[in-house]
């Protein structure tokens, strides 16, 4: 009962976290509920950038890749290497998932560092990078959790749950709690870093001439890429861990 109540409280905590707001948000009223409009708008922009870039790069594929095709093949090879390193020889089916996570977070983070979302005037609220909203990072973390549960169950069936009593049944509560804290650590790490970067850039732009914040923006681009890589690497590591059945 203690483990069950702890798990329920953790899930309730994730729901409560979704109400955290930084800045002025605006909402769409749909039925009896509210939808975070600013997250959807900026997410659609990021998705459009990814789809548009991929379409342009591969619309006329060449045997010997050049230009955009060469760049995207390099990105694909990089994602494959990350997936294979963390998951192992059965990495193939997980490359699309890891790649989607990495590219979405990478472009979202860079949009926060390059695009002045908060300067765009809206009737109500303000825009920000998708990963600047705790709802986005929690959703990505929960998707990762579902992925590694699915990976473990598809590989081992119900025997997957045997990992919770290894190496000793005494660790059952800790092992269960660990699976619920992974989404929290993933989401807070990404949310905190991107939020801090955006706030620093906005403050500097409002206080000093435009040329001064450039070094900070360049640092933000670097850290944004690192955060995307960390998230994707940990997601792949969790999936590989669930398939291997060890910690």
Swiss-Prot record:
GO cellular component, one term: chloroplast thylakoid membrane
Residue spans crossing the bilayer: 38-58, 95-115, 134-154, 199-219, 220-240
Gene3D superfamilies from the UniProt entry: ATP synthase, F0 complex, subunit A
GO molecular-function term, one example from the UniProt record: proton-transporting ATP synthase activity, rotational mechanism
Database matches in InterPro entries: ATP_syn_F0_a_bact/chloroplast, ATP_synth_F0_asu, ATP_synth_F0_asu_AS, F0_ATP_A_sf
Keyword Chloroplast on entry: yes
Membrane topology: Multi-pass membrane protein
Keywords: ATP synthesis, CF(0), Chloroplast, Hydrogen ion transport, Ion transport, Membrane, Plastid, Thylakoid, Transmembrane, Transmembrane helix, Transport
Main location: plastid
Matches recorded under PROSITE patterns: ATPASE_A
Subcellular location(s) per record: Plastid, Chloroplast thylakoid membrane
SUPFAM superfamilies to which the protein is assigned, alphabetical: F1F0 ATP synthase subunit A
Complex formation: F-type ATPases have 2 components, CF(1) - the catalytic core - and CF(0) - the membrane proton channel. CF(1) has five subunits: alpha(3), beta(3), gamma(1), delta(1), epsilon(1). CF(0) has four main subunits: a, b, b' and c.
Purpose of the protein: Key component of the proton channel; it plays a direct role in the translocation of protons across the membrane.
Protein family per UniProt: Belongs to the ATPase A chain family.
Protein name per its UniProtKB record: ATP synthase subunit a, chloroplastic
The species this protein was found in: Ipomoea purpurea
Lineage of the organism: Eukaryota, Viridiplantae, Streptophyta, Embryophyta, Tracheophyta
């Amino acid at each position: 009962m203690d483990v069950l109540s702890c798990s329920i409280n953790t899930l309730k905590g994730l729901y409560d976290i979704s109400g955290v707001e930084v800045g002025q948000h605006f909402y769409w009223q749909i039925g009896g509920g509210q939808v975070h409009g600013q997250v959807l708008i900026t997410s659609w922009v990021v998705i459009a950038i990814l789809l548009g870039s991929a379409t342009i790069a591969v619309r006329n594929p060449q045997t010997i890749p050049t230009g955009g095709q060469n760049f995207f093949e390099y990105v694909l090879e990089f994602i494959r290497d990350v997936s294979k390193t963390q998951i192992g020889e059965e990495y193939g089916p997980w490359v699309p998932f890891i790649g989607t996570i990495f590219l979405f977070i990478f472009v979202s983070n860079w949009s926060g560092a390059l695009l002045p979302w908060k300067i765009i005037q809206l009737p109500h609220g303000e825009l920000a990078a998708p990963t600047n909203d705790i709802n986005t990072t929690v959703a990505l973390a929960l998707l990762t959790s579902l992925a590694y549960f699915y990976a473990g169950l598809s590989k081992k069936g119900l025997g997957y749950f045997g990992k919770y009593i290894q190496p000793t049944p005494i660790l059952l509560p800790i092992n269960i709690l660990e699976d619920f804290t992974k989404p929290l650590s993933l989401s807070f790490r990404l949310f905190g870093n991107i939020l801090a970067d955006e706030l620093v850039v906005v403050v500097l732009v409002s206080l000093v001439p435009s040329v001064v914040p450039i070094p900070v923006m360049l640092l933000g681009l670097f850290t944004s890429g690192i955060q995307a890589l960390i998230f994707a690497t940990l997601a792949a590591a969790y999936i590989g861990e669930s398939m291997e059945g060890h910690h």
